[in-house]
C-alpha cells in the first residue's frame, strides 16, 4: 500500500483516504467502478459507465510550513492530555446520472489529516480524470504492483506521480 495525494493505493484497489476497517466509512475505486463502504452509508456501487463526476470537500489543506506547525501542536496536545483523535473525515461526492450526487464520508490517511495545496489540487484533477475515463484506475494499480511493498514514495515522488497521472493521454 502507498499513499499518493488523497489516494491509498493497494495492489487490488484504490481507496479515497484511509482503507476502512470494520464498519468505518470509506470509498473504494476498482477497475469496475466506485463503491461506498461503511456502516450507515455502505453497499452502494456504480460502474464507471454510470459515474459522471468525482470530487471531495472538507479536506484539510495547508502549506507545508503550516501543516508541520499544526502537526507539532497536535502532538503536544496528545502528549499533555493523552487524548488522541480519530483521523478527520472528509466528504466524497459521487455524481451519477441515475442517483444524482451522492455524498459519502472517508477517513483522512495522511499524518494530521492535512494535505498540501498541490496534493489537493492534483488529487481533485485526478478524480475528474478517473470519472471521465481519461485516467483508468488500472494505471494507479499498475504503478503499485511495480513498486516494492515496503517502500513509500517521497513527497516529490508523490507529486510527480500525481502530475503524471493528471497529464497522461489515454
Model-derived features: positions:
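Eukaryotic intrinsically disordered, low-complexity regulatory linkers and tails enriched in Ser/Thr/Pro
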Residues: 1-26, 37-43, 53-170
